[in-house]
């Protein structure tokens, strides 16, 4: 009987690490609902479900109050396999002083923000060594915190809810050395997540600038080269039935339903896992922001423009290192 080689075993662990995170929301949600329905309908153990719901109500605001991270979870060896699968690489252009707080603004979102999760919700890329004295708080959809056990898993990585109250708390109640991480394009940017794309949803998104001004914290641009190369999408005929449905659905729930595909459990198979393609994230220079309690729209627009200029500069300085043409520019929509 032939045993798998060390290389084959490592490859299998890399694939499993990506699979378990990519589908954890679906698996945990399905399991929690099924088990609790069974307890309530078919057993006398319905009080267990009541206790779970009571805890959920009691703990409801924790994701908006700094979350509940577990350092040991962030250091799981599983995340190293997750990072090696692509692989992921995190680079900085400037040192970050831990005597201040920051808002790190990430681009592009991609379909599942794999790079951002690996870099900032785990220690697989060596965040604490690259940015000593800085505590990262990656912000994500509030829906991830609605389901018992899933919310615990997500919060254990240091993730918090992406809401105004959450950002206010992190920037005012946690001392200094905190980095609030927002992937500003959100799910609306998924429709532009195509290999080679450099299109960002940013033109009308200035709330993060207003928050930075109100707290007087620097904005840091970050760009993940390769994030949009992790999946392919089928593009439906513009104006056709499916395309109209996609746009209608996005207008209703702010999520663009994509017909995406990647690889399967083996390298050359078809499936819904991301392709094993490198993602390198460049963290730029902090952009200083004055503290203005109630900034006018003109002031917000001014610093929004300055931020976009800094992001373009970061992109242009590094794009050719990652196979992007010298003539290709960021498209801000």
UniProtKB/Swiss-Prot annotation:
Activation/inhibition comment: 11-cis retinoids act as allosteric modulators of acyl-CoA retinol O-fatty-acyltransferase (ARAT) activity by suppressing esterification of 9-cis, 13-cis, or all-trans retinols concurrently increasing the enzyme specificity toward 11-cis isomer.
GO process terms (BP): acylglycerol acyl-chain remodeling; lipid metabolic process; monoacylglycerol biosynthetic process; retinoid metabolic process; wax biosynthetic process
Pfam families recorded: DAGAT
A single GO molecular function term of this UniProt record: diacylglycerol O-acyltransferase activity
Residue intervals passing through the bilayer: 15-35, 38-58, 130-150
EC identifiers of the protein: 2.3.1.75, 2.3.1.76, 2.3.1.20
Lineage: superkingdom: Eukaryota
Localisation: Endoplasmic reticulum membrane
Coiled-coil annotated residue ranges, if any: none
Role summary: Acyltransferase that catalyzes the formation of ester bonds between fatty alcohols and fatty acyl-CoAs to form wax monoesters. Shows a preference for medium chain acyl-CoAs from C12 to C16 in length and fatty alcohols shorter than C20, as the acyl donors and acceptors, respectively. Also possesses acyl-CoA retinol acyltransferase (ARAT) activity that preferentially esterifies 11-cis-retinol, a chromophore precursor of bleached opsin pigments in cone cells. Shows higher catalytic efficiency toward 11-cis-retinol versus 9-cis-retinol, 13-cis-retinol, and all-trans-retinol substrates.
The protein, known as: Acyl-CoA wax alcohol acyltransferase 2
């Amino acid at each position: 009987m032939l045993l798998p080689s060390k290389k084959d075993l490592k490859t299998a662990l890399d694939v499993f690490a990506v699979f378990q995170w990519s589908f954890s929301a679906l698996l945990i949600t399905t399991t929690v609902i099924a088990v609790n329905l069974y307890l309530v309908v078919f057993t006398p153990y319905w009080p267990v479900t009541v206790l779970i719901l009571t805890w959920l109500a009691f703990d409801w605001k924790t994701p908006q109050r700094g979350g509940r991270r577990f350092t040991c979870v962030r250091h799981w060896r599983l995340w190293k396999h997750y990072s090696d699968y692509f692989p992921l690489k995190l680079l900085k252009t400037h040192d970050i002083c831990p005597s201040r707080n920051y808002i790190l603004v990430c681009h592009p979102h991609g379909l599942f923000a794999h790079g951002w999760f690996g870099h900032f919700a785990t220690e697989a890329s060596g965040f604490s060594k690259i940015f000593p004295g800085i505590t990262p708080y990656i912000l994500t959809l509030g829906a991830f915190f609605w389901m018992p056990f899933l919310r615990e898993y997500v919060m254990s990585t240091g993730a918090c809810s992406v809401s105004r109250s959450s950002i206010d708390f992190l920037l005012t109640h946690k001392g200094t050395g905190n980095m609030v991480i927002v992937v500003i394009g959100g799910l609306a940017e998924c429709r532009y997540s195509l290999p080679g794309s450099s299109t960002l949803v940013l033109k009308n998104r200035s709330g993060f600038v207003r928050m930075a001004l109100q707290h007087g914290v620097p904005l840091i641009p970050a760009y993940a080269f390769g994030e949009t190369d992790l999946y392919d999408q089928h593009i439906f005929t513009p104006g056709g039935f499916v395309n109209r449905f996609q746009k209608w659905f996005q207008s209703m729930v702010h999520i663009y339903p994509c017909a995406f595909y990647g690889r399967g459990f083996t390298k050359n198979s078809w499936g819904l896992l991301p392709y094993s393609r490198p993602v390198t994230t460049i963290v730029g220079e902090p952009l200083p922001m004055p503290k203005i309690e109630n900034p006018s729209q003109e002031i917000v627009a001014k610093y929004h423009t300055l931020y976009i200029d800094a992001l373009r500069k970061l992109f242009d300085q590094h794009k050719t290192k990652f196979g992007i043409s010298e003539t290709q520019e960021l498209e801000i929509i």
